[in-house]
Amino acid sequence: MSIGEMLAATVPMVRTLKLEYLETTPEKAVLALPDQSEYHNHVGGPHAGAMFTLGESASGAVVLAAFGDQLSRAVPLAVTAEIAYKKLARGTVTATATLGRPAADVVAELDEGRRPEFPVAVVIRREDGAVTGEMTVVWTLRPNN
């Protein structure tokens, strides 16, 4: 089962918004929010809440790809999230999330008995490539014990 399939099966908002997983690696995840009139805002583009969910979901996908092998001993949790809306979004938008620290450094902190935190940067773009939003989600790996 792919990360996209797993998240679609376990996170209802992924199914609700029909998010599409275009690429998922331990360094980067790319998701798309299809253009759907039921999730438009007052100016006919994707609602800010839908774009936030897209960005947070992309960040979660890269976290799972990078740290999926640690799930037996730690649970990934979003700590903070900040988004800046830059331009009007229209049509399908994509979110590209990139891990902000080397995964090995994060795992080393976990190995030391600490609860590591790390940023994931997200860029949201229209189909023409224009950046419509930028987001940072800080994640932690909370040890299970």
Residue ranges of model-derived segments:
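Short structured motifs
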Residues: 15-19, 79-85, 105-107
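Short connector loops at helix/strand junctions that flank enzyme active sites
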Residues: 16, 26, 46, 76-80, ...
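Catalytic strand-loop segment that frames the active site of acyl-thioester-processing enzymes
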Residues: 16-46
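Hot-dog-fold acyl-thioester-processing enzymes
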Residues: 34, 38-61, 72
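Hydrophobic beta-strand-centered segment that forms part of the acyl-chain substrate-binding groove
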Residues: 62-101
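HotDog/MaoC-like acyl-thioester-processing domains
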Residues: 89-90, 100-145
